[in-house]
């Protein structure tokens, strides 16, 4: 456990908790009492508390969570996560900080253009699109910086890239909390157009991870622009190639239902309870898609009328109510959207990558559909890799932070080889 203490300018004491082994970081807590030699803190979100006294630079005390109590010692210092692939200077390439305007949404996208040595207008450029949830330009998670690692590798192999903070996150402006995949597509289009038209690169493609791959296909499927004379002109917002990492090929509700079932099974939940919850969740999502949130909320009791009256069922029903009442635009768009049509009508060269142990976008669920929709695409399944394309034991999210590898070297090489093969 790592307790992070901070004193604000107004003197207010703050504390957060990290549990690297469990992949949990930044859990907000309360400083109940602190003095020169004593501290009492609590974390209501997880029901954990700690009270201790400092002596000879060590804080000794009792950590409690539910019925569990343990004596622990805290030593001052910082925890340095081992991330050997994170790029460190000096770099054999140059970078430029660039702000790109999306005028239709009143958004400024801040990002990094990475340029290999001796680049020119024919140098291929990859615009990177992050997965779901607001993330910075490095797609940083659990101390890993996948997009920074990819940008570094590509630059060392003669390929330029642009990665940017999601709207409303990092240095980018706008509101990302109410944005849907369609909004992120417009952001990516503005970036792609800028790289092609302002930076004057001829070969510009997209690399999308998870939801970012969906956004890439949505751009790839957009029709060519026609002039009044019915002559086709090249749309500067269409990609010349797509790298789709952990790409979904089924409707969003199917992805979320599968994720929920997987998490329940990982928690050793009995099969009958998993089945009850999956069926109910399917019905809730269907009502949200075809009717509205209010009807979904009002239907929960009827949907769950045959459930047993157990604490587990009660907790799961409470979770269903939260989902039904969630009016977030992103969720309501995502559950009803299928990327199938976009994948089917994308005409540029495509490389799709799946991790065998990905439990967030399972290859078993998505890869057959992708193969059917994109028969000309290069599609590859990587043994032992999870959703971040790290070598993993189980693929569980909790493993992400415990793995030193940020992304498989084989994946990096395959991405570079694909791009080089397209432009030469």
Task: Tell what function each PLM region has.
Residues 1-55, 60-65, 125, 147:
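Central antiparallel beta-sheet cores of small beta-barrel/beta-sandwich binding domains
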Residues 122-132:
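Short beta-strand element of the alpha/beta-hydrolase
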Residues 178-197:
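Alpha/beta-hydrolase active-site loop
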Residues 245-342:
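Accessory cap/linker subdomain of secreted extracellular hydrolases
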Residues 346, 352-354:
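Short beta-strand/loop motif that positions the catalytic acidic residue
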Residues 348, 361-372:
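Short alpha-helix in the alpha/beta-hydrolase fold that links the catalytic acid
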């Amino acid at each position: 456990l790592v307790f992070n203490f901070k004193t604000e300018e107004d003197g207010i004491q703050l504390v957060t908790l990290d549990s690297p082994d469990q992949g949990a970081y930044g859990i907000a807590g309360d400083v109940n009492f602190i003095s020169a030699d004593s501290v009492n803190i609590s974390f209501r979100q997880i029901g954990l508390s700690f009270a201790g006294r400092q002596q000879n630079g060590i804080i000794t005390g009792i950590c409690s969570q539910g019925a569990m109590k343990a004596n622990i010692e805290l030593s001052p210092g910082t925890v340095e996560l081992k991330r050997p692939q994170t790029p460190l200077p000096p770099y054999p390439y140059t970078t430029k900080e660039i702000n790109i305007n999306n005028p239709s949404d009143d958004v400024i996208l801040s990002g990094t253009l990475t340029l290999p040595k001796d680049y020119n207008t024919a140098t291929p450029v990859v615009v990177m699109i992050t997965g779901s949830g607001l993330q910075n330009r490095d797609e940083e998670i659990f101390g890993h910086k996948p997009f920074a690692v990819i940008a570094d590798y590509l630059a060392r192999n003669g390929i330029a890239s642009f990665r940017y903070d999601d709207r409303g996150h990092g240095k980018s402006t706008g509101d990302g909390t109410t944005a849907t995949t369609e909004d992120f597509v417009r952001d990516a289009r503005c970036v792609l157009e800028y790289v092609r038209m302002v930076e004057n690169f001829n070969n510009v493609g997209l690399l999308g991870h998870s939801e970012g791959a969906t956004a890439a296909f949505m751009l790839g499927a957009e029709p060519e622009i026609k002039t009044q004379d019915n002559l086709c002109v090249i749309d500067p917002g269409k990609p010349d190639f797509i790298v789709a990492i952990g790409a979904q090929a089924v409707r969003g509700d199917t992805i979320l239902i599968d994720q929920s079932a997987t998490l329940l099974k990982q928690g050793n939940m009995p099969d009958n309870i998993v089945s009850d919850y999956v069926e109910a969740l399917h019905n809730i999502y269907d009502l949200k898609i075809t009717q509205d949130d209010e009807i979904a909320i009002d239907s929960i009791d009827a949907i769950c009328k045959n459930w047993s009256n157990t604490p587990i069922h009660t907790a799961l029903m409470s979770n269903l109510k939260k989902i039904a009442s969630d009016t977030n635009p992103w969720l309501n768009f995502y559950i009803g959207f299928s990327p199938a049509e976009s994948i089917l009508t994308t005409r540029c060269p495509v490389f799709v990558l799946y991790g065998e142990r990905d439990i967030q976008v399972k290859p078993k669920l998505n890869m057959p559909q992708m193969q059917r929709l994109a028969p000309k695409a290069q599609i590859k399944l990587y043994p032992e890799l999870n959703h971040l394309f790290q070598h993993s034991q189980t693929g569980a999210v909790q493993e992400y932070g415990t793995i030193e590898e940020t992304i498989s070297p084989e994946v990096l090489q395959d991405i570079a080889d694909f791009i080089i093969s397209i432009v030469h």
